[in-house]
Amino acid sequence: MASGNNAQASGDNSNNIATGAGANAGGNNSGNLASGLTALANGDNSRNVATGRSSNASGNNSRNVATGFVARAYGDNSFNTATGTNANAYGNGSANIATGPNSNATGDNSFNIATGVNTNASGSGSNNVATGNAANAFGANSSNAAAGYLANASGANSANIANGTQSNASGTGSFNIAVGNGANASGNGVANTAVGNGANATGANSSAYGNGASATFGNSTAIGNGATATRANQQVYGTASNTYTMTGVTSAASTAAQSGPVQLVTTDAAGNLASTSLSALGFASPADIAGINSQLAGINARLNDLDGRTGKAVNGVAMAFAMSGSPWLMPSEKIAMSMNWGTFQNTNALSMSAALRVSEHVQASGGLTYGTNGGGLGGRVGMRVGW
């Protein structure tokens, strides 16, 4: 059925419909619909629908749909959909979807989706998705995703993800992720990650987390606002203005997790961390400390012995004082005895002495003393001769 000046509907065994001046719906065994000035819906064994001025939905064995001024959805064995002025969705064996003015979703055997003004999702054998004005996701055999104004996720055989205004995740055979306005994660055959506004990860398998963080060297990581990795295999945390807290370091579980000799963490003026042994810094090792403790034990034993001897010596002075009181014999006496007490520096001693007249000119004397503060028992004997 054709309705409109120069409208045409044609095809054997078909129910094609053309509505509008110059509209054309054609194809055998089909039910194509063209609605709008010079709209075109064409293809055998198809149910293509073109709605809008100069719209085009065509392809054999297809269900392509084009809606909008100059919208185009075409391809054999396809289910492509284009919605919006100058929207474009095409590819054989595909189900590409383009939604928005000047949006583009193309590629054979694909399921690419482009949503927004001037968006592009393209690539054969792909599942690329572009969402946001001027977003771009492309690459053959890929699953790239770009979300945000001017976001870009591109590369063949890749699964790159860009999320944020002017974010970029690109590279062949890659799994790069860029999240944040102006974030960039790029490189072929790598898995780089950039998270944060202006974050940049371009070194092989590098990661940058934080606004303005940068990891441009292989296997490097930068974490924190403005953190920058400056060499390969480096892990950078923050900047010189940051402080660091690791609460679990002091836990019993952390201590239990350690094995073997422990070491000290050291740093230089630039904050580069390393570890070293205690002996390397001039500190005593556990073996050294054990040796010192053994020596101290010996010294303490000697000091204890010396202290005991000193105590005896002090008490000995008190014993000497006590012994100094020897008895003397009167002319009529043959035996005399005396008892004395001596003290010195808070120590005490007791003594007992005796004198014996042996003959008219000879006297013998002797005594015993006992120090009560560790001095022990002492004694003396003596003889006096006079004429």
Language-model-detected regions and their locations in the chain:
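Small/polar residue-rich beta-strand/coil "junction" motifs that cap repeat-based extracellular fibers
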Residues: S3-A7, D12-A23, N28-L40, D44-S55, ...
